[in-house]
UniProtKB/Swiss-Prot annotation:
Coiled-coil region(s): none
Presence of the UniProt keyword NADP in the record: no
Disulphide connectivity of cysteines: none
Name assigned to this protein: DNA polymerase I
Pfam families tied to this protein: 5_3_exonuc (PF01367), 5_3_exonuc_N (PF02739), DNA_pol_A (PF00476), DNA_polI_exo1 (PF22619)
Any one GO MF annotation of this record: DNA binding
Record's subunit section: Single-chain monomer with multiple functions.
Top-level taxonomic group: Bacteria
Function (record text): In addition to polymerase activity, this DNA polymerase exhibits 3'-5' and 5'-3' exonuclease activity.
InterPro entries: 3'-5'_exonuclease_dom, 5-3_exonucl_a-hlix_arch_N, 5-3_exonuclease, 5-3_exonuclease_C_sf, DNA-dir_DNA_pol_A_CS, DNA-dir_DNA_pol_A_palm_dom, DNA/RNA_pol_sf, DNA_polI_exonuclease
Catalytic activity line of the entry: DNA(n) + a 2'-deoxyribonucleoside 5'-triphosphate = DNA(n+1) + diphosphate
Annotated keywords: DNA damage, DNA repair, DNA replication, DNA-binding, DNA-directed DNA polymerase, Exonuclease, Hydrolase, Nuclease, Nucleotidyltransferase, Transferase
GO biological process, one term: DNA-templated DNA replication
Length: 877
């Protein structure tokens, strides 16, 4: 699954206020040379730096309150009344906090008549749209924000100053308070909020409010059944304060439809303004921040650094091509990211002293390319469009940076900053983005390319030194670079796709959708927009009176998990679930794949080699790794993927590779023994964990539960998570996990040791020394630390499995080349390799692929490969 954008939304007003009081007892110590108090600025910067390092957001916005008067004060005049006067020492710092935020490349925003909560809630709602791909982290000191948590949004509440946060997710909220996000609003309505000065219901505190909501589910349902309560003072208060309770509910509800003048695109994180930031630090007296800026690649923070002069030669004829040296760098520029559809717009080569730039593509046919570049795979594909075969290089700066650190992107501007080799503007600053993407004037274009060459040339020595220190140089030379060549060949080859088959599948889906629509209308008793959650909610929960599971910020939740719980209560729900699944296949894969078919009748996906933190490959334009296979309509999509003439598709898939890797690195004798004897590992686990003596007595359900335990342990699952997955009690889930570790003690030891190693070193490694940094392994926040521990446990397993697959692909490509075989590698999907194999080579190549994959690496247990062939990908799988 492709990595999501990470949106960080910060309640600037709340966090800045807490920052001020975090260092309030040192107010006189924190002063700028001009006498300005700086304690809030300093603490806010410290908090922000920590968040940026931990979350690594792609998009950030800091929201501020615009003033005391908002639409809520119009509803309730005393809203936020009675607060103490804001200290002057804090008020004077706010403008400078905002100035600092701007220089850090972060957007801040405020909106008249609305609070920061509403800005954040509205942007969070935008990030839920189906056509965007965001995970959202909200940071605040205000618990009201908890109502915004959902599957893609977590809320971190500052607990102590600005250094410690409590992370809320739907699961954590349910575990801690027994509430859903919408119920949290109702809790605030009942108990009121002394900070915001609305009273709720007299004498109802958190404990009573929770008890009422656990009994009645919602504020509305409570008041519909208030007469059923026993006579008491609480009942009298509820009845007397009904109007205030519902007003408090309105006041507590965050407005997710505020009329913002910005969108998600405006939250994109920009480069720091190094020169201005350095000057700001000087003015504030922040010497340690200035020192870190210099250490992080800010250089001498002056105007000269930002606009450091660069000299280059513009080449129009072939005379200078002969001057290319093997030790030089070369770089090819395109305007868009999808290089299968883009053309080279300019290129550059040279070293830190002498640089050449050109737009004359004819020169490329005469060039003897240097041995250093950035993104070899992209260059190999682009040059193939000109019938030029680029030899494999010795150094790829993009891949080197990826191996050194996966916690930030691998752009050349990032390399410039991390390795302190000068300032480089981002491509976004030069070319624009979205609809504003365009080539600049040649003068700007050539200057930018020349600066890229200089950064790459200056950074190489530092990058190689770090690779050698980390024992990773072999990963670059023996794995990632050869793999880049294999992937380039696969991308250039592409896979044939039948548009007619896709259209036929599409027509079948449309018929099914039309039939399902009629059935749903009949069962519902009226026509409505099935794709509208709001209209669907009215049908299910008001007309059909189905029990309300949970609510969203805008009404009834009709999420998949909610509908699955209701499926047994009404036949219309099962039909709606089926409709949704088919509709997604139709829109995303049938209609989505057809435009991706190139003129040669093939789809040429792009494999992203430098994205995931574990080393796994991802696929984009289109993503062929996410075609659904659990649904027949999804599997049918694979019928459109076909071999070349007189060939078959061969699918070879590693069996349970991650569990085999776990057996090897944990050295657990029982797991090793099961694999060595060819036992069904899930059946074996069921017998050991559930106390079943004979394999034939293991039921399908036993095996399914054991499988969930096996893979759950690999991913560091908790008893809470396992209980949800299996539909059992937490007590039973805890017993399963404890018994598992008793039966497989080597796994328990591995998990304890790898977490300890991560704490000591700050990173974990695969069997090939691929590193993943674990920055939160010592976090004080329980949830953050727990996630880091699970990541530490899983990363060596998943990463080692990914490395094994890469080794197999490299060896297989080499073997096919040596045999001068006509068979070709086409796709890599998860643990599966797909080849196009001529019929006359089929038996030999099947044996070769199986042997090559199973012998890719020697483990304590055998690797096992399952293979199938077919006239379509559907048949081969």
């Amino acid at each position: 699954m492709e990595d999501k954008n990470r949106l960080l939304l910060i309640d600037g007003s709340s966090v800045a206020f807490r920052a001020f009081f975090a260092l309030y007892n040192q107010l006189d110590r924190f002063k700028a040379p001009n006498g300005l108090h700086t304690n809030a600025i300093f603490a806010f910067h410290t908090m922000l730096s920590s968040l940026m390092e931990r979350i690594q957001p792609t998009h950030v916005l800091i929201a501020f309150d615009a003033g005391k008067t908002t639409f809520r004060t119009e509803m309730f005049a005393d809203y936020k009344g009675g607060r103490s006067k804001t200290p002057d020492e804090f008020r004077e710092q706010l403008p400078f906090i905002k100035e600092m935020i701007e220089k850090l490349g972060i957007r801040h925003y405020e909106l008249a008549n609305y609070e920061a909560d509403d800005i954040i809630g509205t942007l969070d709602k935008m990030a839920e749209a189906p056509d965007v791909n965001f995970d959202v982290t909200i940071v605040t000191g205000d618990k009201d924000m908890i109502q915004l948590v959902d599957g893609n949004t977590r809320v971190e509440i500052s607990k102590k100053g600005v250094a410690e946060f409590e992370e809320f997710t739907p699961d954590y909220l349910l575990e801690k308070m027994g509430l859903t996000p919408s119920q949290f609003i109702d809790l605030k309505a009942l108990m009121g909020d002394s900070s915001d000065n609305y009273p709720g219901v007299t004498k109802v505190g958190e404990k009573t409010g929770l008890k009422l909501l656990q009994e009645f589910g919602s504020l509305e349902n409570l008041y519909e059944n208030v007469e059923t309560l026993k006579a008491s003072k609480m009942k009298d208060n509820l009845i007397a304060d009904k109007e205030m309770a519902f007003l408090s509910q309105q006041l507590a509800t965050i407005n997710t439809k505020a009329p913002l003048e910005i969108g998600l695109e405006d939250t994109l994180l920009k480069e720091k303004n190094v020169a201005e930031l350095g000057q700001f630090y000087d003015e504030m007296g922040f010497s340690q921040f200035k020192s870190k800026l210099l250490a992080d690649g800010g250089g001498e923070v002056t105007d000269e650094t930002v606009s450091e002069e660069i000299k280059f030669e513009i080449v129009t004829d072939k005379s200078s091509v002969a001057s290319v040296n093997a030790d030089d760098f070369f770089y090819l520029e395109t305007l868009g990211e999808n290089y299968h559809r883009e053309q080279i717009v300019a290129f550059a080569w040279g070293n830190s002293e002498k640089i050449y730039v050109s737009k004359n593509l004819d020169l490329l046919t005469e060039m003897k390319f240097p041995e250093n570049t950035y993104d070899f795979k992209k260059n190999r594909v682009l040059l193939s469009h000109l019938n030029i075969e680029l030899p494999l290089v010795k150094f790829d700066a993009m891949l080197a940076k990826y191996l050194i650190s996966t916690t930030e992107d691998n752009k050349i501007s990032t390399i410039a900053r991390l390795f302190d080799v000068g300032h480089l503007a981002t491509d976004e600053e030069i070319f624009g983005k979205g609809t504003k993407l365009a080539l600049p004037d040649d003068e700007i274009l050539f200057d930018h390319l020349a600066r890229k060459i200089r950064v790459l040339a200056r950074a190489k020595e530092k990058m190689m030194a770090e690779l050698i220190e980390n024992e990773q140089e072999h990963l670059l030379s023996d794995m990632e670079l050869p793999l880049a060549e294999v992937l380039a060949k696969m991308e250039i080859t592409g896979i044939s796709v039948s548009q007619n088959t896709l259209e036929e599948i599409g027509a079948e889906n449309e018929e099914k959708l039309a039939s399902l629509t009629r059935e749903i209308y009949d069962l519902a008793g009226e026509e409505f927009n099935i794709n509208s959650p709001k209209q669907l909610g009215v049908i299910l929960f008001e007309k059909l009176q189905l029990p309300v599971g949970k609510k969203t910020k805008t009404g009834y939740s009709t999420a998949v998990d909610v509908l699955e719980d209701l499926a047994a209560l009404s036949p219309v729900v099962a039909k709606i679930l089926e409709y949704r699944q088919i509709n997604k296949v139709q829109s995303t894969y049938v209609k989505g794949l057809i435009p991706q078919i190139a003129d040669d009748g093939k789809i040429h996906t792009r494999y992203v080699q430098d994205l995931t933190q574990t080393g796994r490959l991802s696929s984009v334009d289109p993503n062929l790794q996410n075609i659904p296979v659990r649904l027949e309509e999804g599997r049918k999509i694979r019928k459109a993927f076909v071999p070349s003439q007189d060939s078959l598709l061969l699918s070879s898939d590693y069996s349970q590779i991650e569990l085999r890797v776990l057996a090897h690195i944990s050295a657990d004798e029982h797991l090793i023994d099961a694999f060595k004897h060819g036992a069904d590992i899930h059946t074996s686990t069921a017998m050991r964990v559930f106390g079943i003596e004979k394999a034939e007595d293991v039921t399908a359900n036993d095996r399914r539960n054991a499988k969930a335990v096996n893979f759950g342990v690999v991913y560091g699952i908790s008893d809470f998570g396992l209980a949800r997955n299996l539909g059992i009690t937490r007590k039973d889930a805890k017993n399963y996990i404890e018994t598992y570790f008793e039966r497989y003690p080597g796994i328990k030891t591995y998990m304890e040791n790898i977490v300890r190693e991560a704490r000591d070193k700050g990173f974990v490694e695969t069997m090939s020394h691929r590193r993943r940094k674990i920055p939160d392994i010592n976090a004080r926040n329980f949830n953050v630390r727990g996630f880091a521990e699970r990541t530490a446990i899983n990363s060596p397993i998943q990463g080692s499995a990914a490395d094994i697959l890469k080794i197999a692909m490299i060896n297989l490509d080499k073997a096919l080349t040596e045999r001068q075989s006509k068979s070709k590698l086409l796709l890599q999907v998860h643990d599966e390799i797909i080849l196009d194999v001529p019929l006359e080579e089929l038996e030999d190549i099947k044996a070769l692929v199986k042997q090559t994959m199973e012998e890719a690496i020697e483990l304590a247990v055998p690797l096992k490969v399952d293979d199938n062939t077919g006239k379509t990908w559907y048949e081969a799988k």
